[in-house]
Every structure is written in structure tokens, then in C-alpha cells.
């Protein structure tokens, strides 16, 4: 209870209360008040002291002691009339240019934006003649009439010529679709999809889930399909984040990189890295790729936000691109429901990756665009089982995928059109209706399922991937529109190459400079991506045209350097197993199969020598007594003498067999010794999967085995029997 005559305390209490900054740390913990805070709180509680007549005896600390009526005097100093902060125009221009470069660089982050004059940058970007609502502030009469208050009106043009030029420029840049002031006649007819299933991912509920994830996350990860990265991007969401949420970090994850060649993955990473940080990823619980690099990147983002206890990472993207699979891969166990169909994730959910990083799974969202129904189906947005006429989309599958891949997948050599292909496939797979008619509906669903799940090899080539056939010709202009792997007319291709050759002869030097600039730019971009793309286990088998592009020398150098860096860090045994995998596509263009086999044999022999050295070092560390070593060497010399005497005699049958075995041993040395786990796995594979089959082989059931010939016991049965006898 406060004393009735207590007027507040201005000094510091020396007791053990919270107003003593020097008290012993006890129940208060670490966050105790400091001396300045205690003085400030005491100041709030103070009251001036007055006598019985109401005159102030003791004023407050922050009150002035100057008597009332005294004339205040300001010190005459030039600083009162100068600017508080002065910056030169050249310095401001330099700061603006440097800041613009940093803001456009996807691999740089501005740490303290609040302490920088960001308003100067944004205001200077807008032109002086930006359109404003001038009539609301200055009327026409106050500018041009007899009551005008301005000497010179602010006009866009100073003369008729400039006015004509401005009118022509505005006419050329006019877009009727973007004109919101245009009066449109509403006829009540709109262009919409025929079926509701083609509107999946566009409902208000799904978009509400998306905005929840974006608002709750500090880092937004857009998952893309490596087969068609530009087709699965969402430019609307990217523009929304850049305009409305510029403080949130956006990165790209190129998932399903095991379905495309390695060079295409590398080129797409280089192209997409110009906009946002991009990582190649393969979602798999058993054999993932890019998991360590992704977790390291998230940790770096966590270090940027030191003011927060934890950060949230939201995963967005098209349906069926693998958002939930990426989260399961990062956690190394199933925490999200996954399925090879679209729409498995219904609502957003939080997953804990580590103490300071949380992951948010989001349903797939599709922005309404001009994509046809076939494009929507082939992107995997729609479930195949719900399509009423799946045979209408088979023609696009046959156009986008190469015929050699189709024939290799379905064992069909040739076809005339989509219907002919479906009929042959139905006859081959036995999908027939009554009367032997082919079941077109079921077969077309099979093909679409194979397309969505990656069983048909297909990928969209990155920009600048299709170059002229002559290696001496320089490439075309950088960053063109990506083209799909379709079969073109050979006559058209020959004419195009001839035209390109004629143009390249006339303009050879400038195009060569452009190609050098583009290669150097590619090298700078790929130098930032610390990923060994040679470790990607590519599943589909591509042809020679798709495996190695025409101009990939700049990327191969970076790949080899990245491999050398990682080989120094990792164990050689692991590298041997990874380099033996046939899926790595790092061989040069001119290598044939013999050269590849020769290179693999050299690598195997190299690692075999390394293992032998390791074994020798291991046994050399064991110390043997001197007496025992002398006895062993004496026995060894005697055995060597006897073997030399026996070798003079004629070789026997056993000796011949032994020599034959010794000759076969060097060829088997290169083979790797199987571990105990691999031997047990091979034994399990040889055994039959059915239960109770061996019973009929060893027993006489229904007089089928009248002689009762028991088969030889396995090693496991012999071991158990001997163990049982020893116990007795």
C-alpha cells in the first residue's frame, strides 16, 4: 500500500527489490531492469511538491528551473540554418546504381533496409511527368483562366511536334485488353472450360490456402517440374510477391530432375538462376539428390533472420509437381500424404524440420491462363480417372514425345494417327471389349498415366539448346523462347541451316563475341551453384541426340571442377560406387562404348590399388614379437624350397587344375567382393516366395513322392540341426 504523503522516489532503491539494478540475480532471471530504465520509471511516478498555498516547492526533474517571464535566448549559430544531412548528387547517383544491381541480383540480400534511404530510389524511378490527378488539386480556371495563379502550366509537350510524338507513342503502346476504362458490352457469354475438372486448383478455397501459406512463411519455395519448368511457373504469384511482399525470399526447386538428362538440368538451373536462386532436386526417401544443399540454404536464411526464434518455409507450385515429396525427403520419412495424382494435399499443414525451421505444405494452385485442356492434362493438373474423353489428348502426347521413345516404351514400331496407335496398343496389351473391339478409353488412360508419371521420356529443351549442326557456327542470340522436343520436317531443317550458315558467314565476328559473352555469363551463374550434377541417377534411357547437346564445353569444365572438389571431401569407396552407375552422362561427344569401358576399368583398378594399400597399412600397425616372426619366416622358407622341388617334377592333374584356377584369378580380381548383406540378399532372391512349397518336395503327400527322396538340406537347416545336437 502506498503511503498517503508519498510523492514518488527519484533515487535508486538499495534493497533487493526490482528497482535495484545491483541486486543479486535470483527469481528475476536474466532480463532485469537496468539503471536507466529504473530512473525513467521513477520519473513517471514523480509529482511536484507544493506548500499549503499551492506554490511549487520542488519541481520535477524534467521541468525547467527558469523563472516565468524570462526571455529565452537562442545561441547564434549557422548550424540552425543548414541541412542536417547533406549528400551530393553524384554520391546519390552511385548509391542508386549500386543498390539497383544488388536488388536485381538473386544471390544477394539487403540486410538493413530500414536504415537506407529507399524512398530516394523509388521516387527517382518515377518520371517527372507521371500521371497524377491534377484536376483534384488544381482546377482549370486557376491555371488557364483570368483567375490563373500560375505563370507556366505543367504540360507534357512544349510544342505541337512533341505532342504529336507523344500521341503516336501512346497509340502504339495501347492495349485494348488492359484498358479498364473501356466500356465492354456484356453479352452474358464467357469462354470457360467444358468440364469442371479442368478448373482444378482455381477455386477460392485453394487460393485462400495459398495466401495463408504466403502470409505465414518467411521463405517461399516454388517447386517446378524439371520436364517443363516454364510451363509450371506461376508468373502471377511471382509478380505478387515482388510487388506486395518484397521482404519475403523466393527460391526455385527444380524437382524430378531424374527424368531429364543431366545437361538439361544444368542449363535450366543456369537460366532460372538469373531470376531467383535455383536448386536441382530429386525427391526420394532412399536415393535423394540436392537434400544437403537445400537444408544448408534454409539454414542460411535462418541466420539472416536473427530477430526471429524460427522461420517458416512455404512450398507452393502446380499440382503434382512434388511439393509433399520434397518435404518427406527433407524429413527422411513420410510426414505428408503423397500420391502420383493431382489434388492429394487438401489443406495446408505445418511440419517441423528442425528447432528453428518449419515447413508449410500447400495445395497445388493453378492461375487461370490461356492453356488449353490438353495442356492442363499433360501438366498433371487433372486426375486421369476423371477425364471423360482421354483419347482426345493422345495426339498431343505423340507430337511432344519422340516416336523412338514411344515405340521403345510400348513396343509399337509405326502408326498413322492417334486412333491407329491406340488400336495397336489395345491389341498388344489385351484391352478388348466384346467382339474383339479395342478398349480405347482404358488404353488412353494408361498412356496418360504413363505420361504424368514419367514413364515416357520427354523434356522441354532449355533456351539456346538447339544450335546449328556445324560446330564451327556461333550460337544464336541468348535466352530465346524454350522449344519442345518435337520432330520437325527434315526439309525445313535443311533450309533453316542453310540460311543460318549464309548469315553467319557475313556476320561472324559480332556473333562470336555474343557467344563468348553468353558462355562467360553461364560460367558465372553456374559457379554460384555448388551441386554435383553427375550424381543424378537418370531413370529414362535417352537417345544420343538428347544426351549430349551441341555446345556444352563451358558446362563440362564446371562439372569436372565440381567433381574434383567433392571427391576431396568424400570417401573414395563411395565415389567408386557412384561413378560405376551407368546413368551418369558426363562422357564427351566422341567417346564410344570401348573407350567408356576402358575408362571404367581404369577407375576400378585405381580403387582396387587404394584398397590394397589401406589393407597393408592396417596390418602393418599390428606388432609381432621378434621370436614369432623368425619362426614364421623359417617355415615360409622351408615351404618355398619344397614347392620348388615339386615343380621340377611332371605336373599332375591337380596341379593343372590349380594352374587353371590361378589363371582365372587375375580376371576376377577386378570384381568387387560381396558384403554379408549382399550375400544374404542374393540368397533370399534365389529362394521361392511362396510358403509351404518345400513341404511337398520332402514328404509323401498323396503318394506323389513314394520313394521319399528328401532334398539336400540348406545351410541354415544344417546349422540349426547341429546347434540342437550340441544343446543335447
From Swiss-Prot:
GO terms for biological process: ribosome biogenesis. The modification N-acetylmethionine is found at residue 1. PROSITE patterns: G_CP. GTP binds at residues 317-324, 361-365. Residues 498-520 have a biased composition (Basic and acidic residues). Keywords: Acetylation, GTP-binding, Nucleotide-binding, Nucleus, Phosphoprotein, Ribosome biogenesis. Residues 480-489 have a biased composition (Low complexity). Residues 1-33, 462-521, 538-595, 636-728 are annotated as: Disordered. It is found in: Nucleus, Nucleolus. The keyword Flavoprotein does not apply. Residues 10-22 have a biased composition (Polar residues). It comes from the Eukaryota. Residues 718-728 have a biased composition (Basic residues). Residues 553-586 have a biased composition (Acidic residues). Residues 207-368 form the CP-type G domain. GO terms for cellular component: nucleolus. InterPro entries: G_CP_dom (IPR030378), GNL2_CP_dom (IPR024929), GTP-bd (IPR006073), GTP-bd_ortho_bundle_sf (IPR023179), NOG2_N_dom (IPR012971), P-loop_NTPase (IPR027417), TRAFAC_YlqF/YawG_RiboMat (IPR050755). It holds the Pfam family MMR_HSR1. GTPase that associates with pre-60S ribosomal subunits in the nucleolus and is required for their nuclear export and maturation. May promote cell proliferation possibly by increasing p53/TP53 protein levels, and consequently those of its downstream product CDKN1A/p21, and decreasing RPL23A protein levels. Interacts with LYAR and RPL23A. Interacts with the nuclear importin-beta receptor and, at a lower extent, with importin-alpha. This is Nucleolar GTP-binding protein 2. It comes from Mus musculus (Mouse). The gene is Gnl2.
